[in-house]
């Protein structure tokens, strides 16, 4: 949890926070108010925070949402931090949070998507985090290519995506929805993901962790609107989504942009 102990009018502060719902990433604590977000993002952060050194590095978070991971990265003293997310609400959340958690204004927030990286930030970053984005892209290869070109030579990508548990070179392409999400297009096996990454030029593909999503990590709270994980799973068999697919399984990976290709 990110904590700010400054004193504010609790009623006014809570009203501002609730007006910015839904809070997907967090939690945060401002004064005596805990923003109990849908996702306990500390679980994911604990899996990736030591993936690669960030000190004095130029670092990007692609799909940064409200900046939770960016605020966490400040503790590791990177040279610079840039977050990318085209979402309007999440930028408003970031602008609300930044005065509490980035008082020195070190974070740059760009309202851009992964597809904008190649043109606007070529060969720019030592490290890119791309967490929970790839399966939302209609062309995952193009997304990986954009990430590749935004990295410097010897730069590293830390990637989190939904995967399917299969030894085969296959990817799930949901017919209409996956766990009620309409914007999930491809969920690869690890071997397919490795092939995609190598095809665009990455090397040293490394599995950091594989973890099932549970209600401990994603659940309904007063700080979101609508449903959450338990509503997306088959109530008679929570190992399946409502559509009959395997329940969410996430893989965490690291890879390198080599010096020569």
Curated annotation (Swiss-Prot):
Catalytic activity: carboxy-S-adenosyl-L-methionine + 5-hydroxyuridine(34) in tRNA = 5-carboxymethoxyuridine(34) in tRNA + S-adenosyl-L-homocysteine + H(+)
Entry keyword RNA-binding: no
Gene3D superfamilies associated with the record: Vaccinia Virus protein VP39
Enzyme Commission no: 2.5.1.-
Positions bound to carboxy-S-adenosyl-L-methionine: 25, 39, 44, 63, 114-115, 135, 250
Family annotation (CDD domains): AdoMet_MTases
The protein's assembly and partners: Homotetramer.
Primary role: Catalyzes carboxymethyl transfer from carboxy-S-adenosyl-L-methionine (Cx-SAM) to 5-hydroxyuridine (ho5U) to form 5-carboxymethoxyuridine (cmo5U) at position 34 in tRNAs.
Protein name: tRNA U34 carboxymethyltransferase
Species, as recorded: Helicobacter pylori (strain P12)
Gene of this entry: cmoB
